[in-house]
């Protein structure tokens, strides 16, 4: 999940889970039975590999009863968007659940890493990066946000997927002078246009320059209706 990094990483918040980073080490043979995520070769197609990683991690979180939601380009795909997936697979979890989520993935044989940024954890599945996000668009992941998630099929696996309005807000809010790649988000907006409460998204970030420019572009391309000015 792309996030605006124009400022330095903020200090760790009070009460944030203290997960120790995992040190990199050479791969060594192990004697235990292989875990399910290693039973098959990773797909050669990058988009399919990202999709398989999302399905695997989603199935692990769902099977362990965690509260979460799929986000990012795989969530756009689940809502009917393009199957051309970008960068990685993203999941939203509450900060308070980070330790338990990390334990579940570690038990399944995945290595969970703590990057310098304090708003996510990272792991790798089928050679693809998977981000576990505590914040979306500078907003904390909340119980209400996760409660709005929809249970949708991601290929053969059903899982909670971020609601279309929350998903578009998370894609648009980070736009700034240093992060303004409208292309992929425009494609997502076209795919999700009928599912999104656009006025809700506008109220969240439409007064800031780059999100406002994106809304103007959506209007000119007839993706959304022009905003009605009060009389």
Model segments located where?
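Compositionally biased terminal segments of proteins
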Residues: 2-6, 11-13, 17-231
């Amino acid at each position: 999940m792309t996030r605006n990094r124009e400022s330095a990483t903020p200090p760790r918040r009070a009460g944030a889970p203290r997960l120790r980073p995992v040190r990199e080490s050479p791969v060594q043979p192990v004697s235990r039975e292989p875990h399910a995520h290693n039973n098959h070769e990773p797909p050669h197609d990058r988009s399919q590999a990202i999709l398989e990683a999302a399905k695997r991690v989603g199935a692990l979180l769902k099977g362990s009863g965690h509260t979460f939601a799929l986000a990012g380009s795989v969530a756009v795909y689940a809502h009917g968007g393009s199957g051309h997936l970008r960068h990685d697979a993203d999941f939203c979890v509450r900060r308070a659940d980070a330790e338990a989520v990390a334990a579940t993935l570690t038990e399944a044989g995945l290595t969970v890493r703590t990057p310098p940024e304090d708003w996510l954890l990272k792991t790798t599945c089928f050679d693809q990066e998977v981000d576990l996000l505590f914040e979306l668009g500078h907003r904390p992941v909340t119980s209400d946000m996760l409660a709005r998630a929809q249970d949708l099929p991601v290929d053969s696996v059903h899982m909670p997927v971020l609601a279309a309005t929350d998903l578009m807000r998370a894609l648009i809010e980070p736009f700034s002078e240093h992060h303004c790649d409208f292309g992929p988000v425009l494609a997502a907006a076209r795919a999700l246009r009928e599912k999104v409460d656009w006025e809700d998204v506008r109220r969240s970030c439409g007064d800031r320059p780059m999100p406002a420019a994106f809304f103007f572009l959506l209007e000119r391309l007839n993706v959304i209706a022009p905003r009605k000015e009060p009389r």
